[in-house]
Amino acid sequence: MTQFASPVLHSLLDTDAYKLHMQQAVFHHYYDVHVAAEFRCRGDDLLGIYADAIREQVNAMQHLQLQEDEFQWLSGLPFFKADYLNWLRDFRYNPEQVCVTNDNGKLNIRLTGPWREVIMWEVPLLAVISELVHRYRSPEMGVAQALDALESKLVDFSALTADLNMSRFHLMDFGTRRRFSREVQQAIVKRLQQEPWFVGTSNYDLARRLSLTPMGTQAHEWFQAHQQISPDLATSQRAALAAWLNEYPNQLGIALTDCITMDAFLRDFGTEFATRYQGLRHDSGDPVEWGEKAIAHYQKLGIDPLSKTLVFSDNLDLKKAVDLYRHFSSRVQLSFGIGTRLTCDIPQVKPLNIVIKLVECNGKPVAKLSDSPGKTICHDKAFVRALRKAFDLPHIKKAS
C-alpha cells in the first residue's frame, strides 16, 4: 500500500468539459471505433517511481459513477441528449484499459479500448499523476501558498490593466490536468469568481458545484482520429469539422486549429465552416502571428472578425493574456484559458509538463503536427510524411 491510499478523485465529472462533449459525439457517430493513447512527459522528470501509486489510483477510478444530482444537472444543459446521458449513467472506468509501467525510471502509460471509453481517461489520469507527484515532492505546500501566490499576481494584474477597458476581457480556468491538487484548483477558482472578468471553468465538477459556466469544445484527438476514420487523408480535417457541426450545429462552436498546423487548417476552413463556427482556439505557435492569420482569414472571407471569438490557451499566464488583449481587443472577441499558471503556480513547486495523446485509431497511426515542433507526436514516420504530403506541408521537423 502506498503512502496515499485514499482516492484522489471523487467525481466522474472531475474532468474537462470537452471530454464529455467529444464523448457524446463519439457515442453517436463512432461507437465502435477503437483507439490507443500514450502518456508523455515533455520535461526531464523521471516519474516511473510513482507507477505503483498511479496504478492504485487507476484501480480506484472504477468505483466512480455519475450521481443522480450530477445526472440531473447535465440534463439541464442544452447540448446533451438523453440517450448519451443514460449511457453515461452506467459508464464505469475499466482499469484493464490502462497499462502503467516503470521503464528504468521513465513512466510509461498506454491506454487501449473503445474510443467512447478511452476518451475519459486522459484528464483525470493526468490530474492524478500531477497530484500524486506534488504530494510526494511538496507535502508542506497547498491551498494557502497557492492563494498567496494568486493574490500577488492579481495585484500585478491590476497594475497592468489600469489603463485598459477590461469589459471584453474573459478568463477561464483550464487547469484541471496539471493542477497541484483538487483542493488548490477549487480554491483558485473560488477566488477568481470574485473578479468580473472570470467567466467559467473547463472542469465540469467545479462548474456544477460553484454554479459556473462549463467551458470547452473539442481537443486534438477529435481531428487525429478522423485521419483514420475518414476514407481520404487529405479531407480528414474537413470531415472532423463537419462531423462536429453534425453533433453540435448551434453550440460548442470553437474549433481547434493546430492538429495539422494553422496554415493547413485555414485552407480547410472555408466560408461555410468560418460562418457556422463561432471562433477558433490557439494552442501552439506564436499567438500574435496566429491571431493575425485568423483575423485576415475572416476578412478575406467577408466575415467581420468582431462577430467571432479567438480563444488563447497555450501556456498562458495573466501577463501574456493582457498583452494579447491589448493587441487584439479592438478587432475580435477574445477569451483566455489559463491552466498550469493558475492551478500549479506555487513558489518552489515545479509543475509537470505532461500529456496523454492519441497514437492509433482502429489499429492505424494518427499524428499531431502542431505549430510548435516539440509538440509533434507520432510513432510512424511514414505516416507523418503521408500526412504532411496530404496537407501540403513543408519538410518535417523531427517528430518526438
UniProtKB/Swiss-Prot annotation:
One GO process term, biological-process aspect: NAD biosynthetic process via the salvage pathway
UniProt KW keywords: Ligase, Phosphoprotein, Pyridine nucleotide biosynthesis
Catalytic activity reported: nicotinate + 5-phospho-alpha-D-ribose 1-diphosphate + ATP + H2O = nicotinate beta-D-ribonucleotide + ADP + phosphate + diphosphate
UniProt-listed Enzyme Commission number(s): 6.3.4.21
Cited SUPFAM superfamilies: Nicotinate/Quinolinate PRTase C-terminal domain-like, Nicotinate/Quinolinate PRTase N-terminal domain-like
One MF term in the entry's GO annotations: nicotinate phosphoribosyltransferase activity
PTM section of the record: Transiently phosphorylated on a His residue during the reaction cycle. Phosphorylation strongly increases the affinity for substrates and increases the rate of nicotinate D-ribonucleotide production. Dephosphorylation regenerates the low-affinity form of the enzyme, leading to product release.
Entry GO terms, CC: cytosol
Pathway linked to the protein: Cofactor biosynthesis; NAD(+) biosynthesis; nicotinate D-ribonucleotide from nicotinate: step 1/1
InterPro entries in the record: N/Namide_PRibTrfase, NAPRTase_N, Nic_PRibTrfase, Nic_PRibTrfase-Fam, Nicotinate_pribotase-like_C
Sites bearing Phosphohistidine, chain numbering: H220
PANTHER family (UniProt xref): NICOTINATE PHOSPHORIBOSYLTRANSFERASE
Family: Belongs to the NAPRTase family.
Function: Catalyzes the synthesis of beta-nicotinate D-ribonucleotide from nicotinate and 5-phospho-D-ribose 1-phosphate at the expense of ATP.
Name of protein: Nicotinate phosphoribosyltransferase
Organism this protein belongs to: Citrobacter koseri (strain ATCC BAA-895 / CDC 4225-83 / SGSC4696)
